[in-house]
Amino acid sequence: MNDANPTLDLQGAPLSRRAWLELVAGAGGAALAAGPMSALAQGAPKRGGVLKVSGTANPSSLDPATGGAGSDHTYLWTMYDTLVEWDYAALKPIPGMASWAYPDPKTMVLTIKPGITFHDGTPCDAQAVKFNLDRGRTEQRSNIKADLSSIASVDVTGPLQVKVTLARPDSALPAILSDRAGMMVSPTAAKALGNEHDRKPVGAGPWKFVSWADNQKLVVSRYDKYWRTDRGFLDGIEFSIITELATGLRSVVAGQNDMAYGLPPRLKPIIDKAKDLNLVTGPTLYCLQIYINLAKKHLDNVKVRQAINFALDRESFVKVALSGMGEVATMQLPKSHWAYEPALANLYPHDPAKARALLQEAGLGSGFELTVGNYTDQDSVRRGEIIQEQLGKVGIKLNFIRGSIPEISGQFFGNEKKFDLLISAWTGRPDPAMTYGLMYGKDAYFNAGRVEVSPELQQLLQESRASENLEVRKQVFSKLQRIVMEQALVAPLAFTLEFNAIHKKVQGYKPNLLGKPKYEFLSMT
């Protein structure tokens, strides 16, 4: 199904093409200025109701340890609680299923809250936490090994207490345990199901898994024995997988879904004009970027990678691809972030002449071709076309292979190594050490070429997690970011804003800096 269809029918009432075009035309003169972060009204939440959501991508996996797509999180959070959580305003770690303490810099003690059970009825106790942390560190299929690389051993010291012995101090570990590494799966289910747990997940979150039809629908329902009473109000959530974002918004306008998230700014006027919809916006760490496989021919030359960065017109990209509503990305942290390094902001001005000179020095003055992974939705295709035009002006021809997010991402980061470049995004993490560790650690999943750039970079990755003092850490990140950008290990493009269209009958939504919806506090009137 695509935008050319005369009607949209996702098991509900159709919205005629004429009605849709009237909405578009009526919104044509609407202001496109993005507002400040906003949240939906917080009335007294009512229990009940099934929330229907337009999901942006098919999950790569429903096992937190084996998945690899940033778009998975919004599904995973329904079925899994995390040992540590983050506050919505600043992503600061706060206790979740467990609290933590550091008796000394190389020891973390986790104290698990009582009464937590998995969806199969088994207890989420110290043994379960040890199983999960060891699984994440050692399982062959785990994609979170880099997150847990500081852990030397995990020991059960009480029914609800675990001692984590560290190989080196790690101040980022609480934030790490608020992400995939802190999502606890049932040991009983994981052992019994093996690889099938990817599709039949058993967690301890507010909702339990019901069904998943690839590229169609994911359904979860309330877990009646959920350990908290102040959240998880919905009876269930149904995700319709609609990768074309404009089509997803149509489904909400037509009343077939209650919510569409991750929308492009170009659709804001339609949301503003539509009846009974709220627009929720907010800043994010979501960085559109070009991933580079450093092991590929030509891209193993720093001059070629630098040429790509000089060839990019980021200001134009934000204007055209994001309707002017975004922030130019000169590194992988936005200007408002505490670890942002302003000295690097002008490292790669738009300079096609410089790009061509670097390619000439690299022996590629007559031009060359690269294969690029790209997604099939309209906005991804448009972003690819913009980049294709910009790089083409300096003699770099891009040949695209397109597919779904899980398919293309897996082919780039997994064993196939199918493309030279990937136009995608880094969706952000609660702590910047996670971002840089997951992308540039020698064996990290998102280091597509599995290349060790330099011993200094690897040392800085460890140092970035060694201190709790933000000023000390900022100095480390300054050095780390300088290596990343001077070596042109990535080509950042822009930071996006969160744009969600939510029906007015839905209450309690809170934006977050990751720009990914969590549903724990949502209720329906």
Task: List each language-model region with its residue ranges.
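N-terminal secretory signal peptides
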Residues: 1-19, 26-33
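N-terminal lobe/hinge region of extracytoplasmic solute-binding protein
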Residues: 54-105, 134, 200-202
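Gly/Pro-rich hinge or "lid" segments in bacterial periplasmic/extracellular proteins
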Residues: 87-89, 178-232, 236, 353, ...
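Surface-exposed binding/hinge segments that line
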Residues: 111, 146-189, 211
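Ligand-site clamp/hinge motif
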Residues: 224-270, 397
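Extracytoplasmic/peripheral linker and loop segments enriched in polar/acidic and small residues
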Residues: 303, 379, 397-410, 435-504, ...
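Structural transition elements
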Residues: 327-361, 379-382
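Long beta-strand-rich cores associated with HINT superfamily self-processing modules
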Residues: 500-525
